[in-house]
């Protein structure tokens, strides 16, 4: 049965509207800011107290790339960061309770090394961490009143306070909250690409672990990429996922009409 036709009347939807501005601050460094309006509706008709949630958030990102000398060749080193979903809380019950947005910090670096005039190889590393505080869990021997006090404190934190506390409140330790992605890419003449990578997430956070392999082909105005994911843990919905992406080069399209 389709979920929309179920007796529970579920009809969820998510919508976001973004406005972004980017600027090159120097020959090697650039930054971008994105402002976002979010509307989220769980779509359940069974609970009359359920309302669509509205929130505002922002992304702040920066990107640096420089050439570094490695032997007789110049390799391109890059570093970037992204603070995403920094904003207000969201409520689905008219403001009685407010939930934290899934703010996230991403740090990434890469090195692209030219083997010769036609062949290049790149290695990349990404680190991700959600900046959402842990909801309090009742401890052994704790009274209901003390537990409720901690819950009330948790709900009263501002979005910024919650983001900062997320770096120190994990019962598993900070390092186990960090998601790690590593990858490598070989390219020939900037037209043919072969890629491979691995994603790791601790079992206490989400337990996503998978390998990925892919290939790409670039022409003057478009690029076609494909990737295949293989999970290393059971019951992963991403297992054996095949993805395709098609991108267009706007400058290349403009040149066709000149």
Language model region names:
Residues 4-258:
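Outer-membrane beta-barrel porins/channels
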